[in-house]
């Protein structure tokens, strides 16, 4: 399946640069690709919860949203959580922050934007790189053209700056 192919290529790029990452994964993808999930963890990367089904939380009841996150975490087993679309209601944030560390980002590649060229995607990232920055890339079909171009060049720039890619730690 597509997600499997993209993650495998991302893992190969990260390995080439001896880089570690935190993958915020969907529970439904962990169910669909358990071997790939295990490969991510076995390679020394960290995983975080990105809900089970990538629902838009602001359109769901608090109870249903929490159920979706907790159902995903039965598969993912992580204390890290990132809401889809970076949108979460105050009530959802309060409830989830009691059990999870909510993690956003410093640099969004916007690799998912079909109107964005691969070069512009790279520029979005490299102009904001700094030590400790959390940079977001995606592993979807929609983002693959830009990610495939920008991620290895970003990893190369990080290396040239004397920085290192690490997982998010609590």
Please tell me what each predicted stretch does:
Residues 1-6:
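Short, small-residue-biased leader/transition segments that mark boundaries at the very start
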Residues 10-11, 33-38, 91-96:
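Distinct, well-ordered alpha-helical segments
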Residues 12-22, 45-46, 52, 62-90, ...:
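CE4/NodB-like, metal-dependent polysaccharide N-deacetylase domain
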Residues 16-18, 29-32, 145-170:
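C-terminal domain-boundary segment and adjacent tail
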Residues 26-28, 52, 83-86, 107-110, ...:
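Active-site beta-loop-alpha junctions enriched in small/polar residues
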Residues 31-51, 57:
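Short, surface-exposed acidic-centric catalytic microdomains
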Residues 51-60, 111-113:
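A short acidic, helix-capping loop that chelates divalent metal ions and anchors anionic groups
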Residues 87-128, 162-170:
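His/Asp/Glu-enriched short active-site or ligand-binding loop at hydrolase and phosphoryl-transfer sites
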């Amino acid at each position: 399946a597509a997600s499997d192919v993209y993650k495998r290529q991302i893992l190969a790029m990260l390995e080439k640069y001896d880089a570690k990452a935190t993958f915020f994964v969907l529970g439904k993808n962990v169910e669909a690709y358990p071997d790939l999930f295990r490969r991510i963890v076995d390679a020394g990367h960290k995983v975080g919860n990105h809900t089970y089904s990538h629902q838009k939380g602001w359109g769901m009841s608090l109870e249903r949203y929490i159920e979706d996150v907790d159902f995903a975490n039965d598969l993912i087993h992580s204390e890290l959580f990132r809401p889809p679309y970076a949108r979460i209601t105050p009530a959802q944030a309060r409830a989830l922050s009691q059990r999870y560390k909510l993690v956003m980002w410093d640099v969004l590649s916007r690799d998912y934007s079909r109107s964005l060229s691969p070069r512009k995607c790279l520029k979005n990232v490299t102009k904001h790189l700094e030590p400790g920055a959390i940079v977001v890339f995606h592993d979807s079909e929609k983002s693959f053209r830009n990610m495939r171009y920008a991620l290895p060049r970003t990893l190369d720039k990080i290396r040239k700056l004397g920085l290192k890619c690490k997982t998010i730690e609590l």
